């Protein structure tokens, strides 16, 4: 599942960041910010117009991401999210 498809307040684990093009600067920057395999992530909120931007929390840090940026991040929903 892509991070952009994750419902709000559902915990997930990052599986990886996909490069849209070779040497993708945005994907590289997302990895530098901490969107790496094994990190827990969740969408905290979404903007009022077109649900943009997404307020995403990874660890104790929050980032505002466009949906197109969040769509590059592959996640797996944590099993305890539905327990």
Residue locations for each model-derived region?
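Short, basic/aromatic beta-hairpin or loop at an interaction surface
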Residues: 8-21
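Small-residue-enriched segments and motifs
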Residues: 1, 12-15, 41
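Short, surface-exposed secondary-structure edge patches
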Residues: 3, 30-34
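C-terminal structural segments of small proteins and small subunits
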Residues: 10-12, 48-83
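Cytosolic, membrane-proximal regulatory domains of ion/volume homeostasis and mechanosensation machinery
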Residues: 1-3, 75
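Short alpha-helix capping/helix-loop boundary micro-motifs
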Residues: 23-29
